[in-house]
Amino acid sequence: MSGVWVFNKNGVMRLVENPYNQSAGDSSESSSSGGNQQQRMRRKILVHLPSSEVVSSYGSLEKILKNLGWERYYSGDNTDHLLQFHKRTSIDLISLPRDFSKFNSIHMYDIVVKNPNVFHVRDM
């Protein structure tokens, strides 16, 4: 079960399973907190801080990661649906979906944590 916990206008919390596909039929909440909810659900972007470049493709991300010492990791089982990067100086592994359209904030924050002060996740 995944989703986002939101407050109704009467103060009761509820779980919204998939906030991006929530039906418009729930008008009781949309009038008071719909704007705030939309702000929390904005798309995220990954920004390379030294160059202020927005990462818009795996090509640009791979170039930046290589400059930081990351190498492509080819694992026999996962090559068809995952891109993986590792650093020889650590045990860290970055695993990303091969399809860039499935690259989301979870993957972005994984990159940020493993590369402190180099990347930042921002609202679009």
Curated annotation (Swiss-Prot):
Organism superkingdom: Eukaryota
Biological processes, Gene Ontology terms: regulation of flower development
Region Disordered, residue ranges: 19-42
Biased segments, Low complexity type: 22-39
Annotated tissue distribution: Expressed in roots, flowers, and at a low level, in leaves.
InterPro entries documented for this protein: FPF1
Record's miscellaneous remark: Overexpression of FLP1 results in shortening of the time to flowering.
Annotated family: Belongs to the FPF1 family.
Described purpose of this protein according to its UniProt entry: Modulates the competence to flowering of apical meristems.
Protein name in UniProt: Flowering-promoting factor 1-like protein 1
Organism of derivation: Arabidopsis thaliana (Mouse-ear cress)
